[in-house]
């Protein structure tokens, strides 16, 4: 049975926040479990979310919920051990929908994980994520 590997000790970073308005659209809303909050990236063709775990974790699934029209057609998942260089784990291809989407891949031990959003469905390259979870 897979469970979330996110904890209070998980440190996250994002490529950008819409209009630098972290109080309304900041990274903290990726993980808060509330339906009405979200992370909104600023415009640009390459956006990402980076998570650093306090220790190595086994990961095998990503759960993402976008706002339709502000999703991504191609995502790359990269990970590494502490102080290592990120290496590609998998590519995955979300649908442009509001529904929660689940992506499975071979189990990896990582202390750092990055999801790169390579091409947004939004003309300006913005990404909106209401829910993100990492399971293993």
UniProtKB/Swiss-Prot annotation:
Q: Where does the record place it?
A: Nucleus
Which coarse location class applies to the principal site listed for this UniProt protein? nucleus
Tell me what this protein is called.
Nuclear receptor 2C2-associated protein
Q: Identify the keywords attached in UniProt to this record, alphabetized.
A: Nucleus
* The UniProt record lists the keyword RNA-binding: no
The superkingdom of the source organism is Eukaryota
Keyword Nucleus: yes or no? yes
Role of this protein? May act as a repressor of nr2c2-mediated transactivation by suppressing the binding between nr2c2 and its response element in target genes.
Q: Which gene encodes it?
A: nr2c2ap
The family line of this record is: Belongs to the NR2C2AP family.
InterPro entries referenced in this protein's UniProt entry, alphabetically: Galactose-bd-like_sf
- One GO CC annotation, please? nucleus
Q: Which Gene3D superfamilies match?
A: Galactose-binding domain-like
Native organism is Xenopus laevis (African clawed frog)
């Amino acid at each position: 049975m897979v469970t979330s590997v996110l904890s209070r000790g998980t440190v996250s970073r994002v490529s950008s926040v819409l209009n630098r308005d972290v109080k309304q659209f900041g990274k903290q809303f990726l993980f808060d479990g509330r339906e009405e909050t979200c992370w909104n990236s600023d415009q640009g063709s390459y956006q990402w979310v980076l998570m650093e775990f306090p220790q190595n974790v086994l990961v095998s699934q990503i759960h993402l919920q976008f706002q339709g029209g502000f999703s991504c057609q191609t995502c790359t998942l990269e990970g590494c051990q502490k102080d290592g260089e990120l290496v590609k784990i998998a590519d995955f291809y979300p649908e442009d929908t509001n529904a929660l989407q689940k992506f499975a891949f071979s189990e990896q031990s990582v202390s750092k994980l990055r999801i790169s959003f390579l091409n947004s469905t939004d003309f300006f390259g913005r990404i909106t994520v209401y829910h993100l979870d990492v399971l293993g």
